[in-house]
Structures are given as structure tokens and as C-alpha cells.
Amino acid sequence: IQVAAQNCWVKKGGAFTGEVSAEMLANLGVPWVILGHSERRALLNETNEFVGDKVAYALSQGLKVIACVGETLEQREAGTTMEVVAAQTKAIADKISSWDNVVLAYEPVWAIGTGKVASPAQAQEVHAGLRKWFCDNVSAEVSASTRIIYGGSVSGSNCKELGGQTDVDGFLVGGASLKPEFIDIIKAAEVKKSA
């Protein structure tokens, strides 16, 4: 088990009250940071490009990154899910030279904290689409080796079916991580890892 911070700032130094620097996390021995979460994109207006800059800087400071991408309900209903997540992923790819220390987390915004969850088929479709995007735009090696995890109302009751999808490599768990059912989610991920 390793610890991840929920955010870090985009550059070194400066007076950015309330922000945590990548250097602080590295000095504390925190190996991971979550960047691009939909709440920060929506509430703090973090753009795709800004998230790309944050990912690049965190990596430059020796952190590993869980980079979040995902669409709103309106975007899903408009049929633009892949365009949206591809643009978010491209903004990261444009700023980094290696995906070795990046895990991509697909988190459909409409499924975060709402109790709604993408069906296993919907999750698989987007994860497979992201792998194809990597293959077409980065490399086949990155497509095969980059972990793509799912986040969005993951629970003890849906984790096995979601985790059973070919391209779902694990979970970014929110509220359920504070409940006893989190053990079921961990066990579902362990089964996938050992399979």
C-alpha cells in the first residue's frame, strides 16, 4: 500500500497559499499524486493544458501520477465521450516524454459520488478507446503497458464485474474507500492482478 496526495501545484516556489508543492510531497516520501480530478477541473477551472503542465512537473520532481480524464453527462449524451477523454489525454501526452510513472484514471463525471456507475461495457468501451488512442498517438508499447483504472461510484457490489473487463486495470475509489466494502474492492483488484 502506498500513499497518494490528492493534488499538487504546477511549479516550484511562489506564494500559492493553500497549494501543496510537488517538492513537499517528495520530501515527505509521498510517492503518488492524483491530478486532473473532475472536481478540480469543474470547481477550480483547471484546463486540460494546466493539468498537462501539472503532470509534467510532478513527474519531473520524482512523483508518480494518477491522471484523471472523464466526460460529463451532457458530453456522454452528445456522443463526444471519446473526443473529450482523448483531448484530456493528449494535453498530458503533449507535455511528457514517458508514461512509465503515469496511471490513467477514467472517471466519468456523471458517476462520481452520484451512485450512478458506468456499466462494465461502457467502462470497457472507453478504456479500449484510450488504449487505441495511445497506440495511434503515442506507441503500441505505451498502449500495452499503461495502467488504465476506473473511478466513479465503484462499490463492493460492482467491482468484480467492472474489474473483469479486459482493459480495466484497477480502480480509483472515492467514498467506498471509507466503508468496510473497500475490502471487497481490494480483493477484486488482487484477483485481476494475479490473473
Curated annotation (Swiss-Prot):
It comes from the Eukaryota. It is found in: Cytoplasm. It is an enzyme of class 5 (isomerase). Its EC number is 5.3.1.1. GO terms for molecular function: triose-phosphate isomerase activity. Belongs to the triosephosphate isomerase family. NCBIfam families: tim (TIGR00419). This is Triosephosphate isomerase, cytosolic. It comes from Lactuca sativa. The lineage of its organism: Eukaryota, Viridiplantae, Streptophyta, Embryophyta, Tracheophyta.
